[in-house]
């Protein structure tokens, strides 16, 4: 039986049309997937789009469109780009897909919740809409995000956090032993550092 090899592109936000960065990433992932197939691996190559978030809602509003209509149009552009580039992905999934994505996400949520792996906490900080992430003061220059030239919003929100600490040792051993391979090596080291930092 052939060794399994899983590869994915990032799932970009559909707040704008695809850009050269996504094309480059898709081509790079495709090269790796094709090479692994040549080596006889059982490859599963996934791509898709992330269709949830504040910047998507804001982009749809700025375009004067319903959010669903907006994400449908933009997701199709990402999918078409992969076809035009001849990318050999096995699947393309959208996070708004109620038939495919939702059931799997809901099942995972129920499982980790049942196992006590979710912790509900209030988090507050500086939120950069462009990054769809919280940032720190040290990430800012003169109070603004350097990538988006915008001041982050001060937010306080209740969120669920995954209790990674419960699995850190097992994950670290799997990575270090090579059972779980992360390519490139710099990303492997980044993940190990993240695990070690708690």
Feature locations, PLM:
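N-terminal, positively charged nucleic-acid-binding surface of large information/translation enzymes
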Residues: 1-198
């Amino acid at each position: 039986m052939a060794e399994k090899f899983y590869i994915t592109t990032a799932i970009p936000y559909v707040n704008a049309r695809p850009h050269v960065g996504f094309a480059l990433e898709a081509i790079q992932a495709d090269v790796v997937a094709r090479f692994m197939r040549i080596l006889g691996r059982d490859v599963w190559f996934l791509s898709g789009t992330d269709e949830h978030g504040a910047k998507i809602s804001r982009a749809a509003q700025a375009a004067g469109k319903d959010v669903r209509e907006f994400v449908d149009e933009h997701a199709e552009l990402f999918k078409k780009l992969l076809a035009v580039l001849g990318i050999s992905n096995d699947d393309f999934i959208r996070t708004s897909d109620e038939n495919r994505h939702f059931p799997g996400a809901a099942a995972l949520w129920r499982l980790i919740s049942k196992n006590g792996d979710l912790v509900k906490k209030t988090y507050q900080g500086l939120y950069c809409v462009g990054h769809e992430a919280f940032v720190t003061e040290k990430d800012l220059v003169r109070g603004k995000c350097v990538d988006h030239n915008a001041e982050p919003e001060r937010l306080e929100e209740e969120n669920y956090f995954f209790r990674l600490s419960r699995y850190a040792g097992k994950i670290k051993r799997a990575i270090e032993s090579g059972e779980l391979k992360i390519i490139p090596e710099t990303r492997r080291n980044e993940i190990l550092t993240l695990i070690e930092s708690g």
